[in-house]
């Protein structure tokens, strides 16, 4: 459950460390983003010489949330942090590596490149 002003960890190697959600890109009046949703975010913390720098406005896809995601089989999954992967306008990851596990819901939403880069899919 990500809403505007929420800080997220960045789970890739674009150089950003923390981003803040500005807008949820899901319908005209969506309040919250969950796993697999695209958000617009501002880079709040970045390492030097990265692909993105502090203050950049980027698109990102949410890959982990603290709030549990309910699945059709009745199970639920939650993670220890809120995390996202920075993407370009074609919805492909800007980085070449993804850190930490990602949720299976990304496969259903069409983010196959992120799923293949992730070390673990839960």
From Swiss-Prot:
Key word Ribonucleoprotein present: yes
Disulfide bonds: none
Membrane-spanning ranges: none
Entry's Gene Ontology molecular function annotations: large ribosomal subunit rRNA binding; structural constituent of ribosome
Entry keyword set: Ribonucleoprotein, Ribosomal protein, RNA-binding, rRNA-binding
UniProt xrefs under Gene3D superfamilies: Ribosomal protein L14 (2.40.150.20)
Pfam families: Ribosomal_L14
Domain of life according to the entry: Bacteria
PROSITE patterns linked to this entry: RIBOSOMAL_L14
GO CC terms of this entry: cytosolic large ribosomal subunit
rRNA-binding keyword on record: yes
Gene Ontology biological process terms from the UniProt entry: translation
InterPro entries, A to Z: Ribosomal_uL14, Ribosomal_uL14_bac-type, Ribosomal_uL14_CS, Ribosomal_uL14_sf
Family, similarity comment: Belongs to the universal ribosomal protein uL14 family.
Quaternary state and interactors: Part of the 50S ribosomal subunit. Forms a cluster with proteins L3 and L19. In the 70S ribosome, L14 and L19 interact and together make contacts with the 16S rRNA in bridges B5 and B8.
Functional summary from the UniProt entry: Binds to 23S rRNA. Forms part of two intersubunit bridges in the 70S ribosome.
NCBIfam families found in the cross-reference section: rplN_bact
Stated name of the protein: Large ribosomal subunit protein uL14
Lineage: Bacteria, Thermotogati, Deinococcota, Deinococci, Thermales
Gene responsible for this protein: rplN
